[in-house]
Amino acid sequence: MMIDFPVTEETILPNFKGGEKEYAAKMFFDGKNRIMCGRLIPGASIGTHTHETSSEIIYLLSGTASVVCDGKPETLTAGQCHYCPKGSTHTMKNNGTDELTFFAVVPEQ
């Protein structure tokens, strides 16, 4: 099954999960799993949240992300991947000067 993100409508989510500014995402949801192409402008973030019934895989396409997962800070750049296991808590912020773009998968477990 093909998901054509270039023609998928973008959703703007202000203060997503208690984060700063807004998260823009093109999303596919089949009732159980989410596949997203997202972007954060400089200074924007996805707030701290726990993956109680899912994990999350985030692959950076461009920009620099500051991620904290279970209290451990990480800095990610394009081509790197962040994994948040089921039961873990994380947050992500664009602390750079360029737009942050990423591909994310949230499979229910």
Give the residues covered by each predicted segment:
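A short, N-terminal "cap"/entry segment at the start of jelly-roll beta-barrel domains
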Residues: 1-34, 47
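Short strand-connecting beta-turns/loops that link adjacent beta-strands
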Residues: 33, 53, 97-98
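Conserved short histidine dyad/triad with adjacent acidic residue
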Residues: 36-51
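Histidine-centered metal-chelating micro-motifs
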Residues: 45-46, 66, 82, 86-91
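Glycine- and acidic-residue-biased ligand/ion/polar-headgroup-sensing regions
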Residues: 53-65
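Structural motif
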Residues: 64-66, 73, 89, 99
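Short acidic-glycine-tyrosine-enriched beta hairpin
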Residues: 72-86
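Ligand-binding loop in jelly-roll beta-barrel domains
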Residues: 86-109
